[in-house]
């Protein structure tokens, strides 16, 4: 069972180089589990016992199953995560021809660790919008193969490279795609048209626009002498998306359960498909009772905001509070912050800790050092948007926001187990 779960995660990570592909991957798995797609632009006809999902912008997804018990009595069990990760995105007019090389100008998306992007075999994926037979359409593309690299400057030409060299994103990050003859001119949109023809078997009249990200082609892997770790891009936060999906599929059908995986968390969530937008509330208002009963249902509900936590690094242990250093493979972490950077309170933390104890899942706590700034999640955003009680949790991770992150392989079981118990729980606090 564990091997199957881990292999499923690796396959999901490899199939999801962008939020668009992650949403497609989640939708495919939901379809296989009997969930039916709902179109936001069409009327909905849902019923108790039904399983449904809806997407927005091709990059956010909400899946839910309507339980047998009325939500005004039992509330809703929600798990939230996000589909996006820090990366390098191609600019609208990206072509650069410098010293005979074809390069693409890129913009840094989110708070990326930039140094690990150098000397990697990079590919390109995302969504392309084009004109075809007089209509505007969109498709996902993925080059799959290594097509670009950002070479480092040799240490002989940069003797201070190992002493804290600052990276200039404008000048130093454009990847090299090809070497051009003096008579050649780079045309990125023509390249995209060729890729559309190869992947989807048609020739567009014109490529109009795109949202494309570079990604590392190295596959997700189990590493360590005892296979203790998962190394992959985008563990933050596709790991939580996958765990939430598995828990939703594995849980009982008695209660109403929701999985929400939104885009744009890494840049503030303020978008039509982000957690700071109306997506979740609009979906809930279409399937829950109206008026007073809607508020009653929300107030009986609980959200588990699942997003990776900072594991205590053996080489940098002083970056953590001495009493709050989460270890990899020691269970999910309850995140707490007095300034509401996390939405956890004593009641929601206590309930999650209770679930872990009841299901023999180890559990840890995280509080940022008092002299350091604290990050945040979709937890406080969703709590303030919806008025739902929330606990912020996540699995301990090294190298968060690097091109390749590290998490504990045993923690995947821990998280799926406790989230399944949460979805199946007959009582909420």
From Swiss-Prot:
Look up the record and name the cofactor or cofactors this protein needs.
Zn(2+)
InterPro entries on file? M18_aminopeptidase_2, Peptidase_M18, Peptidase_M18_dom2
Q: Which PANTHER family match?
A: ASPARTYL AMINOPEPTIDASE
Q: Which GO terms describe its biological process?
A: proteolysis
Q: EC top class, in one word?
A: hydrolase
Q: What is stated as this protein's family in its record? A: Belongs to the peptidase M18 family.
Metal-binding: is it a keyword of this entry? yes
Query: Which cysteines bridge via disulfide bonds?
Result: none
Residues annotated for Zn(2+) binding in this entry = 82, 156, 401
In which organism is this protein found?
Answer: Ectopseudomonas mendocina (strain ymp) (Pseudomonas mendocina)
User: Which CDD domains does the record associate with it?
Assistant: M18_DAP (cd05658)
Q: Does the keyword Lipid biosynthesis apply?
A: no
Organism superkingdom = Bacteria
The alphabetical list of record keywords is:
Aminopeptidase, Hydrolase, Metal-binding, Metalloprotease, Protease, Zinc
Q: Name one GO molecular function term.
A: metallopeptidase activity
NCBIfam families per UniProt: PRK02813.1 (NF002759)
Note the Pfam families from the entry: Peptidase_M18 (PF02127)
Record's protein name:
Probable M18 family aminopeptidase 2
Entry EC no(s) = 3.4.11.-
A GO CC term attached to the entry: cytoplasm
HAMAP family, per database record: Aminopeptidase_M18_2
